[in-house]
Amino acid sequence: MAKEIIFSDEARNKLYEGVKKLNDAVKVTMGPRGRNVLIQKSFGAPSITKDGVSVAKEVELKDSLENMGASLVREVASKTADQAGDGTTTATVLAHAIFKEGLRNITAGANPIEVKRGMDKACEAIVAELKKLSREVKDKKEIAQVATISANSDEKIGNLIADAMEKVGKDGVITVEEAKSINDELNVVEGMQFDRGYLSPYFITNAEKMTVELSSPYILLFDKKIANLKDLLPVLEQIQKTGKPLLIIAEDIEGEALATLVVNKLRGVLNISAVKAPGFGDRRKAMLEDIAILTGGEVISEELGRTLESATIQDLGQASSVIIDKDNTTIVNGAGEKANIDARVNQIKAQIAETTSDYDREKLQERLAKLSGGVAVIKVGAATETEMKEKKDRVDDALSATKAAVEEGIVIGGGAALIKAKAKIKLDLQGDEAIGAAIVERALRAPLRQIAENAGFDAGVVVNSVENAKDENTGFDAAKGEYVNMLESGIIDPVKVERVALLNAVSVASMLLTTEATISEIKEDKPTMPDMSGMGGMGGMGGMM
């Protein structure tokens, strides 16, 4: 297929048009008074969302060059969501503002490479300043405030997440599910999560979520590789008679054995799934033992004189449910005895007290959290399926933002932290590098401007007032239309969200600004069907039979 090559300003301007269209769709969702976006689906009812990344993912433009620009910024939103869990709209708005301002300067003759260098230096300085401005999350109240802001000022969701984190600890596992009623619920269940996903996508039982969901499964634990399925046959036959699912956790399951399990799953002979054992070496053995104690099973280990062939159904662990995605496995309500679990917890605590290695201590604490923390399940209720999806998106965002806040600390919210950080940096740059730094510094006003605009206030006046405020914690509460102490009012953001959004925005904007040529496919118009209107008389050909 023929390709079209476009150069310099013409190429960048086309890319900018795509970025602008994406930004225009995403920016309306920003802030406490942001609006919803209605998205048509190829099947089913349209969805309503106020989640920036959900809007960005749906934007596909007709013009291939514009779509290239939009897709790069869409990637920024998606990457920010993956890394920080929130800040997707902030990243999009910043990327657009930096690209717009940079394009104007490059069109006027600035050197793109020098401009990029200045942008990178400014970004580095602002990130360092944000870290200085941050402070640790002190208590449950602040956790609730972070979650509330991220859940579009929904205090109920904020309090629910704070309760969940209080019950399972900051390192505990919190999952979000759909409730059967219209009420939100919080359930804490004993459970364990480890970072190993399914060995084959053919094990998936929930195609929409791309997860394996096993109800009341047996759990087989083996500390070596499974290469030959013949050794597994005795226990598989016993499992088949019970009609229950089976989860195999082993060092690995090699080609032929895995293929046979997949075939049996697809034919409906066995409801089975398999994951690799977590950890490596001695730590893997210890974690398998943790899982065995939690589920009331035994690790089949050749070191203990046991072979896979000798395994019986009595050696298997059990749980009320197991959920596996491509990255993680969560075991809920293991059937292990509480006394054994408590003894194991105390043993790990003793090891933590004795160890001199920071790395070992960190890994032991991870095991302790998995064994004793349990799993908190937030069940989201709503009157309709559309509302349910929108609300679940907000809870997921809020949960990720809260974890980010606990991880790296908090700064004042509402776009004010970026402006306060900008005021503190002093860069000694010359020429086009100074222009690059100034572009980033000016763009830092964009999130606050957008929040004020969406709330119906004069953006210029709001930004000016926040910039000139004497108290460094002063910002604009768009929900009330007042200038307040953001910390006292509970309007706070995780510093990780601000940092990741800025880094990703500068990264994509600098790539776009240093683009000198684009290559895209030329869309050929497909010939239209010939007019058949003159052939109406052919209907009488039925008489030829």
Curated annotation (Swiss-Prot):
Any idea which positions bind ATP? 29-32, 50, 86-90, 414, 477-479, 493
Q: What class of enzyme is it?
A: isomerase
Q: What is its EC number?
A: 5.6.1.7
Q: Which Pfam families match?
A: Cpn60_TCP1 (PF00118)
- From the UniProt record, which GO molecular function terms apply? ATP binding; ATP-dependent protein folding chaperone; isomerase activity; unfolded protein binding
**Family annotation (InterPro entries):** Chaperonin_Cpn60_CS, Cpn60/GroEL, Cpn60/GroEL/TCP-1, GroEL-like_apical_dom_sf, GROEL-like_equatorial_sf, TCP-1-like_intermed_sf
Keywords of this protein's UniProt record, alphabetized?
ATP-binding, Chaperone, Cytoplasm, Isomerase, Nucleotide-binding
* SUPFAM superfamilies assigned: GroEL apical domain-like (SSF52029), GroEL equatorial domain-like (SSF48592), GroEL-intermediate domain like (SSF54849)
Reactions this protein catalyses: ATP + H2O + a folded polypeptide = ADP + phosphate + an unfolded polypeptide
- Please state where this protein is localized: Cytoplasm
Name the Gene Ontology biological process terms: protein refolding
A GO cellular component annotation here is:
cytoplasm
Q: Which residues form a coiled coil?
A: none
Q: Which CDD domains match?
A: GroEL (cd03344)
Q: Which family does it belong to?
A: Belongs to the chaperonin (HSP60) family.
Q: How does it assemble?
A: Forms a cylinder of 14 subunits composed of two heptameric rings stacked back-to-back. Interacts with the co-chaperonin GroES.
Q: What does this protein do?
A: Together with its co-chaperonin GroES, plays an essential role in assisting protein folding. The GroEL-GroES system forms a nano-cage that allows encapsulation of the non-native substrate proteins and provides a physical environment optimized to promote and accelerate protein folding.
Designated name of the protein: Chaperonin GroEL
Q: Highest lineage ranks of the organism?
A: Bacteria, Pseudomonadati, Campylobacterota, Epsilonproteobacteria, Campylobacterales
- This protein's encoding gene: groEL
